Design a protein with these regions (language model features):
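Phosphate/NTP-binding elements of NTP-utilizing enzymes
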Residues: 1-194
Length: 194
């Protein structure tokens, strides 16, 4: 998937060449393989800045949405505007899929909503929706997948993570990424959960 050359990112630091093809790096292939084959479908990834992890998991969730009818995917961040930024990445990746890889007519059509932040895949009954942290944010929903971004720094990170079990029970995928920080996320990454 990573090596296919269909993913483009936006690098706001490089103003001369801000649109870049996703790099074909071995560690990104390994993370992709782990994500695709995780059983149970829980992946926790400690990251450092500028390793493209947020872009990678945004792409993986976009791929999940584009090719699965009825998927309900949630991007959870500390605040709703931050989850909307992740949806901006998804939309950017979608808008920059090369015609040679998939002609526009073959792509599922999308509709973007700003409040609440959501991308709807028209005709597929599939959505990616942005939500803020909090144990009750997804309580009434069932989810195909939940992405928790920078979760180690949330005030209610552990509670938000703990509340996902009924939301994803039965096979829903949970992806937790964050810059390294001691606490519940560190314990999750290194199997030290109580």
């Amino acid at each position: 998937m990573v090596e296919d050359g269909v993913v483009y990112t936006l690098d706001s630091v490089d103003l001369k060449h801000p649109i870049k093809q996703f790099p074909n790096k071995e560690y990104l292939k390994i993370i992709t393989d782990i994500w695709l084959n995780a059983d149970p479908p829980l992946v926790a990834i400690p990251k450092s800045r500028r390793v493209l992890m947020s872009w990678l998991v945004s792409y993986l969730h976009l791929h999940l949405a584009m090719f699965n009818e009825g998927a309900r995917i949630y991007f959870q961040s500390e605040k709703e505007p931050k989850s909307a930024e992740l949806l901006d990445r998804v939309e950017f990746i979608y808008d920059h899929i090369p015609q040679e890889a998939m002609p526009r007519w073959a792509l599922p059509k999308i509709r973007r909503f700003k409040k609440p932040p959501k991308i709807e895949f028209v005709g597929l009954n599939t959505t990616i929706e942005g939500v803020p942290e909090g144990a009750r944010q997804l309580a009434q929903f069932t989810a195909t997948a939940v992405l928790m971004d920078e979760a180690a720094f949330w005030q209610m990170g552990k509670e938000s993570f703990g509340a996902l079990k009924p939301t994803t029970e039965g096979g829903g995928r949970v992806t937790v990424i964050s810059s390294a920080n001691k606490g519940w996320f560190y314990d999750l990454c290194y199997d030290k959960q109580q």
